[in-house]
Each structure stands twice: as C-alpha cells, then as structure tokens.
Amino acid sequence: MSSDESSDGLEELQSLKALYGQQEQEKPAKIKRERYIPKASQAKELNYVEVPMEKVLFGDRQRLLTNLAKSVGQKLPNDDEDEQEENPGQAKPGDKRKAAWSDSDDEDLQVGDVKKATKHTGPLNHLRKDKSYKEYLTARFQRTLNQPKWAEKKVKNEDDEDVSSDEELLRTVGFIDRKARNSDLPQKTLNFKRVKDLNRATYAEGNATSIQFHPTSTAALVAGMNGLATIYAVDGQKNERLHNMRFKKFPLACSRIAPCGTRAFFGSVKPFYYSYDLLEAKESKLKLPGAMEFMHRFEVSPCGKFIVTAGKFGAIHLLTAKTNELLHSFKQEGKVKGFTWSSDSKRILVCGSTSNVSVLNLRQNLIEHIFMDDGCIHGESIQLSPNQRLLATGSQEGVVNIYDYESIFASKAPQPEKRFMNLRTAITDLQFNHSSELLAMCSSEAPNAFKLAHFPSATVYSNFPAQNEKVGFVTSMAFSPHSSFLAFATKGKQVPLFRLKYFKGY
C-alpha cells in the first residue's frame, strides 16, 4: 500500500470516527432495554447473557475503528492511552524486563482452552474465550497484588558502568553484608574448631620440637627428637604425609623453612647442621664454622640471606644461608634464650637469662641498644609483630610484656603498654599472626598452658582453649601464612591443630 493510499484511508477513518462520536453524544446517557425475564422454573435451563447483535457482528465502535486503522497500516493517536486504561497495571514496554526465555505454547494457549464451566464455577460468559491465557493471568495478578519494588527495572546510570563483579554480586544477593566482610576480629570470643592432629598420619616424630607452615604451599613441617622431619598436607581432615626426612643420630632441636620455600634448615646439639633442598629432595651436611659447637636454637632472616644462632656464654653468631660463612659474632650478658628479626633484616632483638634485651645492628655490627624488661628477672622469649609496632617479651615468671617498638629506643627502662599475667610458669614461646591481631603465648611447664590475646584491644580470649580441651605440654606454636590454622608442638606425639574460622584461605 502506498503512502498516498494510507493517508486517504486515515482521513476517511478520522471523519468516520468523528461521525460515530457525534452519534454517541446525541444518544441518552442510559438506554433502558426491555428484557425477557423467564420464570423461576425456566431460570435453571436458561443461563446466558444477552448481547446486542451489532456488538456481536462488529464489536464495539472503538474496536471497529481500531481494526480499520490497522487494516490501512496506521495507528490511531489515542491507541496508547486506551491500552493503558484497559491495563492500568501493565508496565511500559521500555520498563519491562527482558524474559529469560519464552515458550511458544504459552502464547497459543487461550482462556477457553483452560477455563471450563462446571457446577462449582457456574457460567463463564463474562470471560473472553479467545483471549490469551497468559495475559489473563497477568492482569489477574496485577489486580490482586501490586508489582513489588524488587521486580521494578531501575534506570542504569552511566556511573555504574564500571562497577566491579564483586559489587554486582553484592547488589543482587541481598543477604551479603558489605560491613560484615570487612569487620574486625572479635575481641571477646574466638570462633575456632579443633581439627585432626597435624601429624595424625604417622605420629612418628616423637616429642615435637618445632613446627613451621610452608610460606606458599598448604603444607607444614614437623620435626622431633627422633631425628625425623615430616611434611604434611594441611587440610584439617586427612593431613596426609607428603615427604619424610630422616637424619641418623641427629635429634632435631630446631628446624626452619627459608622464606623462599625451597630450602629447609635443621639444627641440633651437634657441631654441624643440615640444609635440605625441598625441590630436589637432597640434603647437605654443613659443618659449623669457627668455634661454634651446636646449633640448637636459630632463626632465618626475612630476606633469607642470614641465619642467627645462639652460642655459648651469651654468644650470638651470624651466618650466611647460602655459603655457611660466619659473618660476625656478638656477645651479650647471660645465656641467650630467644631472638627475633626485624622485617627489614637489619636488626636482631635478643633476650637472655637476665632482665636485659639487646638490639643488634647488622649494618654497624654492634649492639645498638640495651633496655631492661620491666618486672622481668629471667627472660625466656621475645617476638616482634609483623607490622613492626608491638614487641612482646616473656619471662620465666610467666609475665608477658607488650611494648611499643619505637619507644624502646628512647629509654633504657621503657614502660610496657600492656602486661599479661594469665600464665603462671615460664613463657616458652610467643607468636604473632600475620596481621598482628593475635598473640599466642605458651608455657611447656604446665599442661594446656597457652593463651591467645587480641589486639589492639589487648584482651585475652576467655573461650580459648575450651574448658575441657586437652592439648598437653606445649613447647612451640605456629600460625599458617594467613592465620587460618594454629598448630602446637607438644612433649607428646600429637601436634594439635586448630582452625580459626574468622580467617579465610590458608
């Protein structure tokens, strides 16, 4: 059909519509129609609604005009308004969400195919049998209930185009709380669970002397006085054995994994130590240089280049990790009990059998500073937090002092920020977790003598350990790289393992 013919047809329709409208206005507002009313006896047999013949043949006047307009390919100006009046609850096409799928059977299904007159429903003459059943249900639902807000399509802003996938998830999944994801570690109660022992696959190490988690893999190294070191997979359920390293007539007093994760060092009371290549599974026996007679207590620097070890009569030896070369020897008052590295590998803090703590400067190869541990008579252990803000010292009297690391250089008798007196026997070991939010303290002289402290509140968890928890005599502890696990080395065969549920990953 050409455009000229369409325009002519539209003009005829408009004139026809105006004529019909004038006739409608001239008619009275209400026309009384005479209707045959059957008797009561005939009412049951007759069950119909009388419809004018002109409506049956041609439909409503407005519908007739609409159909005529469609036949000439044009749309009346007020069609949209009429559709909105007929379906007030129906959303605009632009506001409608795109259906995830469409079923052609739903479009073909009509009301007459579903709705059948029964003795319960009565006559259904008020329904249009040729109407789509889908539209019928939609209109019925919208009449009963308004569309909920969550079903309304929101207008997308230009600023939301760069929203990350995480924000998309948080916006669509309502039960995820952004604040809960970034919440702080609870300071009153700790959510934990004791899982299977770390060395449950063998229990062959004897009295465990040291534990260390691998820095990059989900594995842990357990060494004992039987001269056996085992690497276990850490999952909290099976904890399968991955590899064994046996050293004949060499009781393992201390073992450490290098920060690179490819090499491990094992020391004892012998005048030599072992370096083990974890990738090639090869061991190297190295003789201690100089006058060194044992290596039963040592630590590897965070950079992996140096090893500091305790000697006789307060001697502190500094070795190279690769070449086994003695770089320097320091001397302090009293027997060396413990030491810890600074994160930049430039300082070593050492505690001894006296009340003094020494700070060694590796650049100048001298003792940079000495201060007295407040209230301490005999020192036992020392640990510097990973964030370099807190320094924890443990004494033989069972007291744990917490210092501000920067403030210890300003005085020879600094005052601690916090003092823990929850344990009554010598503090054997101190360990901070990776985020410096937890401090684990233990004593090997009493059963189940270990506690966890929360920072920055500086409070001790009252529910850890549990009231009837049996762990044994704890000699040392270790956190996994992301603090999800906490393991204890004991004087027995077991290495208890705890899962800290607040921390995710490994």
Swiss-Prot record:
Disulfides per UniProt: none
Keyword Transmembrane helix part of the UniProt annotation: no
SUPFAM superfamilies: WD40 repeat-like
Biased composition (Acidic residues): 1-11
Gene ablation phenotype (knockout): Induces premature differentiation of germline stem cells (GSCs).
Region annotated Disordered, chain positions: 1-44, 69-126
SMART domains referenced in this protein's UniProt entry, alphabetically: WD40 (SM00320)
PANTHER family registered for this protein in UniProt: U3 SMALL NUCLEOLAR RNA-ASSOCIATED PROTEIN 18 HOMOLOG, WD-REPEAT PROTEIN-RELATED
Stated role: Component of a nucleolar small nuclear ribonucleoprotein particle (snoRNP) thought to participate in the processing and modification of pre-ribosomal RNA. Regulation of cell size by ribosome synthesis is an important parameter for stem cell maintenance and function.
Family: Belongs to the WD repeat UTP18 family.
Protein name, entry field: U3 small nucleolar RNA-associated protein 18 homolog
Species of provenance: Drosophila melanogaster
